[in-house]
Amino acid sequence: VKVVITGASGFIGGHLVTRLTGEGHEVVRIARRDLAHVDQLAAVFAGCNAVAHCAGINREIADQTYARVHVESTRNVAAAARTAGVEKIVLMSFLRARPNCGSPYHESKWEAEEIVRNSGLNYTVVKAGIVYGRGDHMLTHLSRALHTFPIFGLVGLKEKSIRPLAVEDLVHVMRAAIVDRRLKRQTIALLGPEEIYLSEAVRRVAEVVGKRPSLLPLPVVCHELMARVFERFMKVPLTSVAQIRILSEGVVEPGSPVVPVPYDLVPTRRFTTEQIRNGLPQGGPFCVGDLRWCS
């Protein structure tokens, strides 16, 4: 098949590109900054069988706002797909996305879902939890934080659970929706097979990188304040405000109704030492070079 992938240079989009090209499918790559003009997109989409819309952000930078990247871009992609006669659109969304929750990230992801569901196109909306793997934010920043700080601050005074989802399992499901044309007009939730506390996830990563940090529960408001500082001064923030909201809620239940995932597509990869090691970057501790004003 011929597939357009938006956000193709990002974490999930990049893994999807690798999977599909490895199977011999033709992939057209589009960056999230190239989604502003419907007519130009329609020309690119012409002759394509499907669009995988993976473009997204977890913090706002200048004109790259949640409204523009998640909502306006999705509206443009859906309109261009209709014009070009694309058969299928697969939207990458977030597990807890929902309306009227007070989080611009969650609400904009929900708006994108609604645009796709009401587009008239055959669609699959994939509401994924916390995804990890080579090139991710979770393992990359967690491991670097462990190399930098002897204390790790847990989000909230009462721990919440997560179900880490291997990017390989996510891409497997997206491939089924695109290539095999499964999951027609469905909104599904994808979570890893193992429910653990964030502290346990930190301990497992720490063991792999050879660190033994002290784990300290901190109020959510403290993390939000630190996240705002990170967003302001770091090129790629250690954490963002949206990520703190995500972790403070827990990531084990969808924020809106979904349909069950077929048995053969249910994620199976556990958050094991091998999986963690395969996804870890080569980088060490944070340094001055991570600050915005350093080249």
Where are these regions (language model features)?
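Conserved glycine-rich Rossmann-like NAD(P)H-binding loop of the short-chain dehydrogenase/reductase
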Residues: H25-R32
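N-terminal Rossmann NAD(P)H-binding glycine-rich loop of SDR-like oxidoreductase domains
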Residues: V1-E23
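Mid/C-terminal beta-alpha module of Rossmann-like enzyme folds, strongest
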Residues: A177-T239, E253-S295
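Residues forming the Rossmann-fold NAD(P)(H) cofactor-binding site
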Residues: G13-G14, V71, W110
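Oxidoreductase cofactor-interface core, primarily capturing Rossmann-like NAD(P)-dependent enzymes
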Residues: N100-K211
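NAD(P)H-binding glycine-rich loop region in Rossmannoid oxidoreductase-like domains
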Residues: L35-A84, F94-P99
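SDR active-site strand-loop-helix element
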Residues: T6, C54-A55, I89-L95, V126-A128
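A short helix->loop->beta-strand "cap" motif at the edges of active sites that frequently abuts
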Residues: A84-K88, L121
